[in-house]
């Protein structure tokens, strides 16, 4: 059975919801899934004053454990068109894994949330994939296999590179049913492709 980690950073709970949906989809695809988050770097008083969602139930991951999984889906909030510093800080601690080639041929996939529809989602998806490529991971994107990302009738999440959601600048918009469905699709797709590669 494929062992998968869904690893996320979420300040306001949007990516937490997307990560849970991706984990559901991966389980539907036959994977054994672990859901974890990266540590918060913002001081607690600042996080509280900014109304961060600090009661997230997912346990904190450690960089060394990434080698224990066949596939890793990273979900991250974005800052100015890049992954949030919390996720970057975590990934910057994986140099030891890189030196040993511990993640070579593992499967990787990415999801992001942005404040606006054009808030750098595709750049953040691709630049996060770069981190995985430096580790020799095999990237499995959302792709246009997920057709529900098409259309302009409503705000839709998704890009060929990975699933996206839009939170609005004040965080008031929650992931839509379509975006959660896309996260489930991506999780299931990654599980099924990983099973073919590592089964």
UniProtKB/Swiss-Prot annotation:
Origin superkingdom: Bacteria
Catalysed reaction equations from the record: a quinone + NADH + H(+) = a quinol + NAD(+); a quinone + NADPH + H(+) = a quinol + NADP(+)
Enzyme's top EC category: oxidoreductase
Keyword Oxidoreductase found: yes
Protein name: NAD(P)H dehydrogenase (quinone)
Keywords: Flavoprotein, FMN, NAD, NADP, Nucleotide-binding, Oxidoreductase
Biased composition (Polar residues): 163-177
Cofactor: record remark: Binds 1 FMN per monomer.
Chain residue ranges for the region called Disordered: 161-181
UniProt family annotation: Belongs to the WrbA family.
Binding site for FMN: 10-15, 78-80, 113-119, 134
Cofactor(s) in the UniProt record: FMN
Tagged with keyword Ion transport: no
Organism of derivation: Brucella canis (strain ATCC 23365 / NCTC 10854 / RM-666)
GO MF entry, a single one: NADH:ubiquinone reductase (non-electrogenic) activity
EC number: 1.6.5.2
Organism taxonomic ancestry: Bacteria, Pseudomonadati, Pseudomonadota, Alphaproteobacteria, Hyphomicrobiales
